[in-house]
Amino acid sequence: MTALTPAPCDLVVADLGGTTLRVGRITAGTSEVHDVKRVPTNGLGRYGALAPQELQDRVMEQLTREIAAHLNRPGQAPAQAVAVSFAGPMTADGVVLAGPTLWGGPAAPLPVADVLTQQLGLPVVAANDVTAAAWRYAAAEPEPFCLTTVSSGIGNKVFRHGEIVIDQLGYGGEIGHWLVDHAEDAAPCECGGRGHLGAIASGRGALFAVRAAAAADASAFARSALAGPSGGVPEAITNEAFAAAARAGDTFARESLRRSLRPLASAVSLLFTAIGVRRYLFVGGFALALGDTFLTLLGDELVRVGCFGLDEYATRAMLALGEDDDDHCLIGIGQLAAARLGAPRAVEVTA
């Protein structure tokens, strides 16, 4: 059972990611997201040749248009507020500072909440996407927790005493850009740097690593469960096949994955040692596709690194997976909107 707060009014909720834009509704007095529409984001992934500012304009036009279409649906009451989760660092007052997966390089700071309010004529709540995802679990987690998304990149947020632990200017919760490999030829990060945690322990980074391992050790690769689906071609290995092989116990796949997860274990150990958070929830397509295998291998590495003062049982017990769906940001931004707009009570719903 997951405790969720019902919406105080009819809401349109949106999750703007680098790959997909999701827009849905939450009916007043409920917490369930329905009528979800998913469309490819009109950003860097589709129009990479365009300049960053042009991409930002294109993304905002699409976001505004799709939200407007959800405000008044046949047979439904008009929505009275909007809540948006956004893939990029954001200030406390809703200004997006960057959009690496949306428009790439530098563009003008984007006051997304103000822009949407002006365009739509409704109150707008906006937050970073990982902040939104963390709010999904806020009512269900009585102790401070760190939510980390492991998908094409890595991001995190710490939720403590009813609030996300970030600076007013949006700094914090970006462990994906923590430098863990100082080599000049370290894996490239989408931000333009190299050797960042998100370039190594993410789904994209782990795939890069297993392909490199396959190319470097042809005989071990040939004996692996990955050889068949890829036709023996390292560059043809997919994340889906990699996750399936690791779950099935394939030694080659699991050892490559273990190496990729080592710096993530170091990040968890550092967070625990620095601020004492003892609950770590993991979401994101790559982590959830691996399931218990992700927790087992990450736990192995975390025990090896160590968490000062904790034994093996207590160390492994800190790690858990979030709900196995792609609605974390939609549900979470609805929860944040309920907290900010005001809601009288919490209800229990089946996860």
UniProtKB/Swiss-Prot annotation:
The chain's coiled-coil residues are: none
GO terms in the biological process aspect are: antibiotic biosynthetic process
Q: Which UniProt keywords are present, listed alphabetically?
A: Antibiotic biosynthesis, Kinase, Transferase
GO MF term set: kinase activity
Q: Does the keyword Lipid biosynthesis apply?
A: no
Q: What class of enzyme is it?
A: transferase
Q: Name one Pfam family in it.
A: ROK
The EC number of this protein is 2.7.1.214
Q: Does the keyword Transport apply?
A: no
Membrane-crossing residue ranges in chain numbering: none
Q: Which InterPro entries match?
A: ATPase_NBD (IPR043129), ROK (IPR000600)
Q: Which reaction does it catalyse?
A: valienone + ATP = valienone 7-phosphate + ADP + H(+); validone + ATP = validone 7-phosphate + ADP + H(+)
Q: Which domain of life does this protein belong to?
A: Bacteria
Q: What does this protein do?
A: Involved in the biosynthesis of the antifungal agent validamycin A. Catalyzes the phosphorylation of valienone and validone to their 7-phosphate derivatives.
Question: To which protein family does this belong?
Answer: Belongs to the ROK (NagC/XylR) family.
Name of the protein in question:
C(7)-cyclitol 7-kinase
Source species taxonomy: Bacteria, Bacillati, Actinomycetota, Actinomycetes, Kitasatosporales
